[in-house]
Design a protein with these regions (language model features):
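Interhelical loop and helix-boundary elements at the membrane-water interface
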Residues: 2-16, 23-67, 76-141
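Selective transmembrane alpha-helices of multi-pass membrane proteins
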Residues: 70-72
């Protein structure tokens, strides 16, 4: 099996997002950084790291609408890992959760996240598709 740039990029995205989420959880838990800030870091990472990583690997994942739709679905469904019984059984998930669990959102933190992810991807996917139809590249620069 050949490790294409798309596969390498997908693995790098998973590792990068996991690292960011563990780091923001540690900032909130051990260094008392306000969750409002760590949550923003997580949101930025979730929506912008994939674009940056694709550019580093010269991957074409952002031109493939099906790949994008599946990635958005998997990312949104991955929030299931943050349900309380799972978090209690797997401590790293609890640490990651603490990076975006604002006190004012409790006990509805996951509901808020589901809606934010769904709304974000509902806007992003059609825009990316439209830009692709127009021949415009998605770029950070």
């Amino acid at each position: 099996m050949d490790l294409t740039p798309e596969i390498q990029s997908t693995v790098a995205k998973g590792l990068a997002l996991t690292t960011v989420m563990l780091s923001t959880g540690a900032l909130a838990r051990y260094f008392n950084v306000k969750v409002n800030y760590t949550r923003k870091i997580n949101h930025f990472a979730i929506f912008f790291l994939p674009v940056f990583i694709d550019q580093q690997f010269n991957a074409e994942t952002f031109t493939d609408f099906i790949y994008l739709a599946i990635s958005a679905l998997i990312t949104t469904l991955s929030l299931v890992s943050f349900y309380e019984p799972i978090r209690q059984a797997i401590p790293p998930f609890q640490l990651m959760f603490e990076g975006f669990d604002r006190p004012e959102d409790r006990p509805h933190t996951l509901s808020w996240l589901w809606t934010q992810f769904a709304a974000g991807f509902a806007v992003m996917l059609p825009i990316i598709w439209l830009f692709g139809q127009w021949g415009l590249e998605l770029s950070l620069i």
